[in-house]
Regions:
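N-terminal beta1-alpha1-beta2 module of alpha/beta enzyme domains
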Residues: 1-63, 67-68, 163-165, 333
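Active-site mouth loops of central-metabolism enzymes
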Residues: 6-18, 74-82, 162-173, 229-232, ...
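Short, acidic/polar
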Residues: 15-27, 87, 171-179, 296-305
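An alpha-helical appendage that flanks or caps ligand/catalytic pockets
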Residues: 120-157, 198-311, 339, 343-344
């Protein structure tokens, strides 16, 4: 199982967030991690430092030499595919062939102020968009309307460093999305938030079946799972250090974690005490069974379970609110875990 780093920027000072990104990227490059993933986020302080993963990936590319630099994810329906093809070809050139993209359909109506006509057809645009990106990177031309309605034939430049830039499809839990990734010969980027173990197993089976049905070989079978991560010397230290930032994150994203407010079971608003109790219980369950929060030894069973399901890479989200220096310090323990899991 390979280990990469994943960023999403929950509630931290932007300057500190960029420092964490760049210092962690240098560490990942030196220690043999697989990739550094940065997201695309818009119009909200949650994820605010990351409006364009091609920019952050270009920054990471210029200070590293081995680690892959990837988007987690590009929300393709928000953009002109010509620009996406151009930007990521530049990243692939700057990195000497280390670029990769996970492609997402998008879900937040607020984001679609960038492309309001695409919201209702966002799913179909992912399929079409992936096919067009591959065509552009291979040197094919596409037709686009120009001034006065005149149709023009255009190629994008530069070409990527490699013949093919690896692609993933981002899937939150929809079986349809897992199957689409297989049909297109893409990897899968997913998570365990609101997705049960049984559902993940079924979805991965659908993915493998679709991949095989489309005629792709085992080399295309790439399954990456994002996990909130903080590995300390002992489990108790890790659990307590991560508790406040994780519960704050869970409070702001309850539906993502499959949680219901206490007020949904009765009348009137939930009391602070009831909400704290709910979040504390949910944190304990998620931290122990769906996150790499603990010691090296306590995190091993989760990695083994994921490996048994066919997961070959973990994208370790380290910037969920833990102080930057604490997150950086914990990377040494994560590197030990990575070494222990190399042969899984």
């Amino acid at each position: 199982v390979k280990f990469g780093l994943f960023f999403f920027a929950n509630g931290q000072d932007t300057t500190e967030q960029y420092r964490l990104l760049l210092e962690a990227a240098r560490f990942a490059d030196a220690e043999g991690f697989s990739a550094v993933w940065t997201p695309e986020r818009h119009f909200h302080d949650f994820g605010a430092p990351f409006p364009n993963p091609s920019v952050t990936s270009a920054a990471v590319a210029t200070i590293t030499s081995r680690v892959d630099v990837r988007a987690g994810s590009v929300v393709l329906p928000l953009h002109d595919r010509l620009r996406v093809a151009e930007e990521w070809a530049v990243v692939d050139q700057l990195s000497d062939g280390r670029a990769g993209l996970a492609i997402a359909s998008g879900w937040n109506p607020q984001d679609f102020v960038l492309a309001p006509g695409n919201f209702e057809k966002n799913k179909s645009l992912v399929r079409d968009g992936i096919q067009e990106l591959r065509a552009l990177w291979s040197g094919e031309a596409v037709r686009r309307p120009g001034p006065g309605g005149e149709e023009r034939l255009v190629h994008t430049y530069p070409r990527p460093r490699r013949d093919e830039v690896p692609l993933w499809v981002t899937a939150a839990g929809s079986a349809e999305t897992f199957s689409l990734a297989g049909e297109l010969g893409c990897g899968i980027l997913t998570h365990l938030l609101g997705q049960s173990w049984d559902r993940l197993e079924d979805n991965l089976a659908d993915y493998s079946e679709a991949l095989e049905g489309a005629g792709y070989g085992i080399e295309r079978d790439r399954v990456t799972v994002m996990l909130h991560t903080f590995v300390a010397e002992d489990s108790r230290t890790a659990l307590e250090t991560a508790r406040a930032p994780m519960t704050a994150y869970m409070r702001s994203s309850m539906s993502l974690f499959g949680l219901k407010s206490p007020q949904s079971h009765g009348v009137g608003p939930a009391s602070d005490a009831a909400m704290r109790e709910l979040l504390d219980h949910a944190y304990e369950e998620h931290a122990r069974t769906r996150c790499l929060i603990g010691s090296v030894d306590s995190c091993l069973p989760l990695v083994e379970r994921l490996a048994d399901l066919g997961v070959d890479e973990l994208a370790c989200l380290i910037d969920f609110g833990v102080a930057a220096d604490e997150a950086l310090g914990a990377l040494r323990n994560l590197a030990v875990l990575r070494e222990r899991c190399e042969q899984l």
